């Protein structure tokens, strides 16, 4: 740009656009699928694996974000450049195994709670409850195949207990405030939908007796 010269030119024939007869306020957009430059195509070795398959001794019956971090560290140590995973967005509709299809998400922003690394969320002070989850962890990890419903039920039980223990502190923290302000545009509707979905026992908002038509001020009364 500073030298006012082109670094490279496309190799394909020139594009032609017939003189269109556009009406006032009309816009014509021509989109080409490819651009043709003599630029070497980047190549890199990598691995394709779904996060739920990364189960380790630290997991709770399913691979989680902690396991993904360990996978990334391994990929770096073996000089791999790419890790391809399946979608990890929240697909929760009925809390049943039918929610396990990764391509049927309810949000393009929210991650599936199942992938949360429990060990990174804090330790339960209730020793009896902590012992119960340690036992459940071994049971879930020992299964020959992932039990979607059992995993999610266990993790949600932990989420509620750790929120009861640490929730007030987290909600009052500056870090949460920054996260909330940066993401509230999608976070609030997602939270309200999730609450109403469970309250009315269906993800089909058309069947809800109330709030079936989106109204932010009214709907947000359900937020804490």
What are these regions, as identified by a protein language model?
Residues 84-94:
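Short, solvent-exposed turn/loop segments enriched in Gly/Ser/Thr/Pro and often Arg
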Residues 38-55, 60:
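An acidic-aromatic substrate-binding cleft motif
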Residues 1-35, 74, 97-100:
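Alpha-glucan (starch/glycogen) binding determinants
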Residues 93-123, 185, 194-201, 205-211:
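Aromatic- and acidic-residue-enriched segments that line the glycan-binding/catalytic groove
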Residues 121-148, 155, 159:
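Conserved phosphoryl-transfer catalytic core
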Residues 64-72:
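Short, acidic/polar
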Residues 75, 85, 193:
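Conserved, mostly hydrophobic/aromatic
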Residues 221-222:
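Conserved small/polar residues in nucleotide/adenosyl-binding loops
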